[in-house]
Every structure is written in structure tokens, then in C-alpha cells.
């Protein structure tokens, strides 16, 4: 009997569970601004992504910022093409010197901001846009997330399906050669 178990143990290789692998679900580029700054923000995001931009309208009145209900207060675009996301991330991280603060990584996602778009390789200054910055949010997922959002026989996902902060760090260090730094400032 021991001979059979030894033979089986030698020939079986440990295979990682494919359902535990993490992947990028989407990347959201967001730029805020009212009135004329909104038009410049739309031009900027179109120039970076080349896709259709969605305008964000405010629901509350904030007089200090000149915002009233129904007024355009920003724009965003959601990208789901993995190759395009990886290409853009590599270009964005060059502006950040290939390092990211640990504080910007949370469960299932990480976020960071680009202060000036002219720092991104391949983008030149556009006089119509001026100097603008934008925010980037990248969301991760595991296989099986569809169960939570499908129409028929919808189910819930346990907490262990969430992508942890440590797993995101490993992904960024291995796939994008990114250095995670522990900054105490911004």
C-alpha cells in the first residue's frame, strides 16, 4: 500500500487553482471640472484612451465650487481591453518613476493620480487643453465574479473571493516591475 501512495505522490504535481488567479477587470480614467474645464477634460481623456467619454452630472448644490444640480461636473471612461490597460499602465507608471505608494492600494483595487498629462510618454502639450491632470483606478477580480451580477440564478460571493492588498502588490511587482513604497506623506 505504501508503494502505491509513494508512486502517486511522486507523479502528481501541485497545480494552482485557476479560480484563485487574479486579473484586471477594468480601468477607469476620471477627470473633474465644471464648464470650460469639463470640455478640456473630455478632450484629454479622448486623447489618452481614444474611446467614448461619459459625462458626470452633479446631483447636489455646492455653491463654493460653483456646482448646481444637473450641471456637468466631470467625465470618465471605463476601459476593459486588457492589452490596452497594460499598455496605458506602463506609460502611466513611467511618470511615477515606477513606484506606487502602499496607501493607494486597497482591497480589489488601486488608485493614483497623474498631475500633468504632458509627463506621459507619447503625449505632447495641446494648447486647447492646457495643463490638466486626471485620476486612474484599476479594479481586480477573480474568476466567478459573474455569479454576483448575472440576471438568472444570481448568487453571492464569499469574502475570500476578494483580491487582497498583498495579492495586488505581488501582481504589480511581477507583471509591471513596479516598486511598492511605504510613504508617510501623500
Protein language model features and the residues they cover:
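Ribosome-associated RNA-binding proteins
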Residues: 4-186
Amino acid at each position: 500500500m505504501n508503494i502505491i501512495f509513494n508512486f502517486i505522490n511522486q507523479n502528481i504535481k501541485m497545480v494552482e487553482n485557476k479560480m484563485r488567479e487574479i486579473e484586471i477587470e477594468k480601468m477607469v480614467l476620471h477627470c473633474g471640472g465644471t464648464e470650460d474645464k469639463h470640455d478640456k477634460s473630455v478632450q484629454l481623456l479622448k486623447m489618452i484612451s481614444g474611446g467614448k467619454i461619459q459625462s458626470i452630472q452633479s446631483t447636489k448644490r455646492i455653491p463654493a465650487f460653483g456646482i448646481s444640480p444637473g450641471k456637468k461636473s466631470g467625465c470618465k471612461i471605463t476601459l476593459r481591453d486588457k492589452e490596452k490597460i497594460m499598455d496605458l499602465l506602463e506609460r502611466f507608471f513611467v511618470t511615477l518613476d515606477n513606484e506606487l505608494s502602499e496607501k493607494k492600494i486597497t482591497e480589489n483595487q488601486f488608485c493614483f493620480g497623474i498631475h500633468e498629462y504632458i509627463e506621459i510618454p507619447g503625449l505632447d502639450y495641446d494648447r486647447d487643453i492646457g495643463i490638466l491632470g486626471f485620476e486612474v483606478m484599476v479594479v481586480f477580480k477573480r474568476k466567478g465574479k459573474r455569479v454576483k451580477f448575472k440576471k438568472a440564478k444570481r448568487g453571492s460571493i464569499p469574502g475570500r473571493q476578494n483580491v487582497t492588498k498583498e495579492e495586488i502588490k505581488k501582481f504589480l511587482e511581477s507583471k509591471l516591475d513596479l516598486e511598492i513604497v511605504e510613504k508617510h506623506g501623500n
